[in-house]
Amino acid sequence: MLKKSDFHYDLPEELIAQGPLPERSASRLMLVPSAPEQFQDCYVRDLPELLQPGDLLVFNDTRVIPARLFGRKVSGGRVELLIERFLGTHQAVVQLRTSRSLKVGNRILLDAGGHAEVLGRDGEFYLLSFDVESPLEQWLSDVGQLPLPPYIHREPDEYDRERYQTVFARSVGAVAAPTAGLHFDESLLARLRARGVEFGYITLHVGAGTFQPVRVALLQEHVMHSEWFKVGAELVEQVRSARARGGRVIAVGTTVVRSLESAMRHGELQPFVGETQIFIFPGYCIRSVDAMVTNFHLPESTLLMLVAAFAGRTRILDAYYHAVQQRYRFFSYGDAMLLFPRNAGEQ
């Protein structure tokens, strides 16, 4: 049985990107073809030469909300709030960071004005009702702070409000960016279109659970967080058309892979709207995509396990070793990989 420790690798802390490069598509791109082909060190801006006319790139069009708030308990203790998802205009599922857990009926006095009341709790998440001056989503857009990942050791600034969004973000609801999409700027998209590459979109609202570590030793015992997603009929038709013309379906990010795999029914992609808790790790056969663009992921994370299921665990760990040796930049604001699938029987 696979263990969490099977997905460990050593990463020097200085390789964790603390901010974006000045140009989105200037990030490096490691090409990881199917074995035994060698890794190639490229740049994201090289993608038009690496892809083929008729290929379909599938993006996640979710938009990050400024979901971080601060306040204090009535007793005076400080509270940090991270909105996980909206439930109507004035309620939300929230993660709280505080010295002591809160109980139903407790109030939080918000620094930005108004207050929130605890209605219930489910594990690490609280259900809060917000008494604020406008609908919660609108209010957050004015007063909320962008929730940068915990491994970025600085406060967010105005530049992050632009750069921690994809240029095609339109469906509001994520608390973390689909980071593979951050590398695509308008110039690169125009060059890909000119190459004959088509674009399609899914929506998956990335939740705060994406940063939660695996806390069990055996992978089979891990329970994934739930996230809302949508695969529309238009995208399903685009995938079918790409397959019919011999084009490849290329996922931009693990959220796209999780969405497409969750929408597979009897071996066929179908339109779907709902929740997914899919956990993809080696032993699972990914059938919905032919390649994927993805960033470098944390050691022992579910995202690293997903890419290992696609490209092979040994192959991925070898690629990560190469990336460390070549001083690639890691995680959300870091560099990317273009992955192709493992060979049959490859571990």
Swiss-Prot record:
Native organism: Xylella fastidiosa (strain Temecula1 / ATCC 700964)
Biological process (GO), any one: tRNA wobble guanine modification
Protein purpose: Transfers and isomerizes the ribose moiety from AdoMet to the 7-aminomethyl group of 7-deazaguanine (preQ1-tRNA) to give epoxyqueuosine (oQ-tRNA).
EC number(s) recorded for this UniProt protein: 2.4.99.17
UniProt subcellular location: Cytoplasm
The protein's assembly and partners: Monomer.
Gene Ontology terms: cellular component: cytoplasm
Protein name, per record: S-adenosylmethionine:tRNA ribosyltransferase-isomerase
Family (UniProt): Belongs to the QueA family.
Catalysed reaction, written as an equation: 7-aminomethyl-7-carbaguanosine(34) in tRNA + S-adenosyl-L-methionine = epoxyqueuosine(34) in tRNA + adenine + L-methionine + 2 H(+)
Keyword terms: Cytoplasm, Queuosine biosynthesis, S-adenosyl-L-methionine, Transferase
PANTHER family associated with the record: S-ADENOSYLMETHIONINE:TRNA RIBOSYLTRANSFERASE-ISOMERASE
Class in the EC hierarchy, top level: transferase
Annotated pathway: tRNA modification; tRNA-queuosine biosynthesis
GO terms of molecular function: S-adenosylmethionine:tRNA ribosyltransferase-isomerase activity
